[in-house]
Amino acid sequence: MNAVITVVGKDKVGIIHGVSGILNENNVNILNISQTIMDGYFTMIMLTDISNSTKDISSLKEIFKEFSLKNSLDISVQHEDIFNSMHRI
């Protein structure tokens, strides 16, 4: 099962490190990643494989919610199918 993780916030040191560390701790594999800085704002989208994760998607959402609050970021974790259906033209 795949999940899409999006991260947006003011750019600062350690965002990718923090997000990838959470994924590593929970055995989540990054399949694809795109990130950019736009006028001082960090944006990243990741496609991840959560099939072998030690946590279910709801638990991962809670972990990222806590991380996002501590770091003033907007982080979304969605099942790939939900993400795709929400972003169709």
UniProtKB/Swiss-Prot annotation:
Pfam families: ACT_6. Residues 4-84 form the ACT domain. Disulfide bonds: none annotated. CDD domains: ACT_1ZPV (cd04872). Belongs to the UPF0237 family. This is UPF0237 protein CPE1496. It comes from Clostridium perfringens (strain 13 / Type A). The lineage of its organism: Bacteria, Bacillati, Bacillota, Clostridia, Eubacteriales.
